[in-house]
Regions:
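N-terminal, intrinsically disordered, polar/charged segments of Gram-positive cell-envelope systems
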Residues: 2-45, 87
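Proline-centered structural pivot motif
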Residues: 38-44, 55-70, 78-99
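Second-shell loop/turn segments in exported
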Residues: 41-43, 64-66, 106-108, 144-149, ...
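Residues in Ca2+-coordinating acidic/glycine-rich loops
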Residues: 45, 49-51, 68, 72-74, ...
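Short, hydrophobic/aromatic-rich segments at coil-to-beta transitions
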Residues: 101-106, 129-131, 170-181
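Secretory pathway targeting signatures of secreted, lumenal, and periplasmic proteins
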Residues: 111-158, 186
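Signature of long, low-cysteine stretches enriched in small and polar/charged residues
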Residues: 149-210
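Extracellular, beta-strand-rich glycan-interacting domains
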Residues: 216-223
């Protein structure tokens, strides 16, 4: 009986290696919000350590930036400005025409007025939101406005509800009005009872603070 012979054939099976999956790309880290204008604030030079910057002494009060008590009355120039007195001679800043009185109305209620004083040499304007703008003509200035508030609400409660201040500084103006300010003292809120006056210091592109004592003087004049 014949038997068909089948030739043996070596079959080579190549091992197929599956490619490893590509690793998933790592998520890009979230970018933190960065204020492009956030720079460190530089205090103005105070050569005689009297509480007034040299710029304030030269451009507003006509005092000697190297003499802490220009009129030799026993009071530092900066202390006199804080209390709204003329540091160069007897009399108040208002009496001597160094500051002028401004009367403003709360935007939402034109029948309710408040007043404050500011340096007479500064330029003023009012923007479309009824914000009063003070231009010191040195790249610095102030923005002042008022918003209505329930007279029964404390300034502390209003500040917590309406602002983002962290650890605000509490104080009282020379006219006895409650006041809150930021840690750097560049923004302040004064309780008018029926409203809150807001005063913001605009340090400008150079981020200098030459008018901090003048800001305190203006806050002390609010009524």
């Amino acid at each position: 009986e014949e038997v068909d012979q089948v030739a043996e054939v070596d079959v080579v099976v190549e091992e197929v290696t599956e490619p490893e999956p590509e690793p998933e790309p790592e998520p890009e880290p979230e970018l933190e919000a960065v204020d492009p204008f956030a720079v460190e604030v530089t205090p103005g030079t105070d050569s005689d350590s009297d509480g007034l910057s040299d710029t304030e002494e030269k451009t507003i009060y006509n005092t000697n930036p190297r003499l802490p008590d220009t009129d030799s009355d026993g009071f530092l120039d900066g202390n006199e400005v804080f209390h709204r007195y003329n540091p160069a001679a007897p009399g108040t800043l208002l009496e001597e025409g160094i500051v002028v009185l401004e009367t403003r109305s709360v935007a939402e209620s034109e029948t309710v007025d408040y007043t404050f004083t500011f340096p007479a040499v500064w330029e003023t304007s009012v923007d479309s939101d009824d914000v009063f703008i003070l231009d010191a003509q040195t790249g610095q200035g102030f923005r002042i406005w008022a918003v209505e508030k329930d007279s029964a609400q404390s300034l502390d409660a209003w500040t917590e509800d309406m602002t983002t201040l962290e650890e605000p500084l509490e104080g009282t103006t020379k006219n006895g009005l409650p006041m809150m300010s930021s840690q750097n003292q560049l923004i302040a809120y004064v309780d008018l009872g029926f409203a809150v006056l807001v005063m913001e210091y605009d340090t400008g592109l150079k981020a200098r603070v030459d008018y901090l004592q003048t800001m305190q003087m203006m806050l002390n004049s609010v009524e």
